[in-house]
From Swiss-Prot:
PANTHER family: OROTATE PHOSPHORIBOSYLTRANSFERASE (PTHR19278), URIDINE 5'-MONOPHOSPHATE SYNTHASE (PTHR19278:SF9). Pathway: Pyrimidine metabolism; UMP biosynthesis via de novo pathway; UMP from orotate: step 1/2. 5-phospho-alpha-D-ribose 1-diphosphate binds at residues 101-102, 105, 107, 129-137. It comes from the Bacteria. Belongs to the purine/pyrimidine phosphoribosyltransferase family. PyrE subfamily. Homodimer. Its cofactor is Mg(2+). SUPFAM superfamilies: PRTase-like (SSF53271). The gene is pyrE. It catalyses: orotidine 5'-phosphate + diphosphate = orotate + 5-phospho-alpha-D-ribose 1-diphosphate. Orotate binds at residues 133, 161. InterPro entries: OPRT, Or_phspho_trans_dom, PRibTrfase_dom, PRTase-like. It comes from Sorangium cellulosum (strain So ce56) (Polyangium cellulosum (strain So ce56)). This is Orotate phosphoribosyltransferase.
Length: 192
């Protein structure tokens, strides 16, 4: 990571600590209990947060096989995909954004993948996630993208909770890059 990237990461971690992180007992989407909650949207949806995640995640794409689009997993991954897509355009390597829905709506386009009109069969796509816990929602998004014709090349997470999710995704054959981990918020405190 470049010096500029390191300072961007430090600022993003500070923003996440300030706006998104709460140390309290919660039940997560996975059904697991946790001693902390991180609502990344509270940081990502600020102008600065949007710029920081766009830059850092675009840079992190360099650790994955080359992609031609980025896909955000509903809901937290959607602003990430938009931020990276905008950054990619500004840096001269435009990548369209896709949004992967959790389920088809019963009205409108009834699509599982929004933005799919530009999706060519076999197109390499990187998935962007806000938080990885078990990896379950990410792996479901992988299947939805594959059904839509994409070739998923890897996953970039804003936060890896270090609870086995990244390992589950890697076990499915996909590389995972995390911008931050639980250690950025709770140093030397293993999950559980």
């Amino acid at each position: 990571m470049s010096a500029a990237g390191a300072s961007e990461r430090e600022r993003l971690v500070a923003l996440l600590r300030e706006r998104s992180f709460e140390q309290k007992r919660v039940v997560l989407a996975s059904g697991r209990e946790s001693d902390f909650f991180i609502d990344c949207k509270q940081s990502v949806l600020t102008a600065e947060g949007h710029a920081l995640v766009g830059s850092l995640m675009f840079e992190a794409l360099g650790a994955l096989p080359r992609c031609e689009a980025v896909a955000g997993v509903e809901l937290g991954g959607c602003p990430l995909a938009s931020a990276v897509s905008l950054t990619s355009f500004l840096r001269g390597r435009p990548l369209p954004a896709l949004y992967v829905r959790k389920e088809v709506k019963d009205h409108g386009s009834r699509r599982l993948v929004e933005g799919d009109r530009g999706l060519v069969p076999g197109m390499p796509v990187a998935i962007l996630e806000d938080v990885i816990t078990t990896g379950g929602s990410t792996l479901k998004a992988v299947e939805k993208l594959r059904t839509a014709g994409a070739s998923v090349v890897g996953v970039i997470a804003l936060v890896d909770r270090l609870e086995g999710g990244a390992e589950a995704i890697r076990a499915a054959g996909l590389p995972v890059v995390a911008i931050c981990t639980r250690r950025d918020f709770i140093p030397d405190n293993p999950p559980g």
